[in-house]
Design a protein with these regions (language model features):
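Conserved, single-site charged/polar hotspot
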Residues: 1-170
Length: 170
């Protein structure tokens, strides 16, 4: 049974690492993790705006593209999207008419996650946008297609640290 197999594996990992901590520069590290990368993990500075952390750098995680959760496509009602964006970011002032002209991805990090996105009159961070709109990842594209807003996300989570899916291949 899958549950028993996973439980046994986790129990073995816990026992094998009992009393151990990870350190960098003689300090206990922050060890973030997430579900599935977009093919690369992210630099902590890009995702969280923290100063560079030597052990939280972008690395390839190509096995993540094999995950069933790697790619997700959703089509949103434009009026609902506009309402959600304006509720989360009132300064945006989005309208349903001509939505493609009001939304622009301004920057991406080296792992292709959105750094900043312009929503009408407001610029917001990719992670902030992801959380406000409940997107699976900040690695996304967004475009009006046939009267709906198509959002394609790659990966699940913030993308910093350990990919849980990728860890299965270690």
């Amino acid at each position: 049974d899958a549950f028993e197999r996973c439980y046994r594996k986790l129990s073995e990992c816990v026992e094998a690492t009992k009393g151990l901590v990870l350190t960098s520069g003689n300090k206990v590290i922050e060890a973030p993790y997430f579900a599935v990368s977009a093919g690369h993990t992210r630099n902590a500075a890009d995702a969280f705006g923290k100063e560079s952390v030597s052990y939280l750098k972008s690395v390839e995680s190509k096995q993540d593209i094999e995950s069933e959760e790697y790619l997700y496509v959703e089509f949103l009602d434009i009026a609902g999207f506009v309402a959600d964006c304006n509720a989360a970011f009132p300064e945006a002032g989005l309208t349903a008419e001509g939505i493609n002209d009001q939304i622009e991805v301004l920057t991406r990090d080296e792992a292709e996650y959105v750094g900043e996105i312009r929503l009408g009159a407001k610029t917001v961070g990719g992670e902030e946008f992801r959380k406000a709109l409940k997107l699976r990842s900040a690695c996304f594209t967004i475009k009006e297609v046939e009267g709906k807003l198509r959002i394609v996300t790659k990966g699940v989570g913030h993308g910093v640290g350990l990919s849980q899916y990728g860890a299965e291949y270690l």
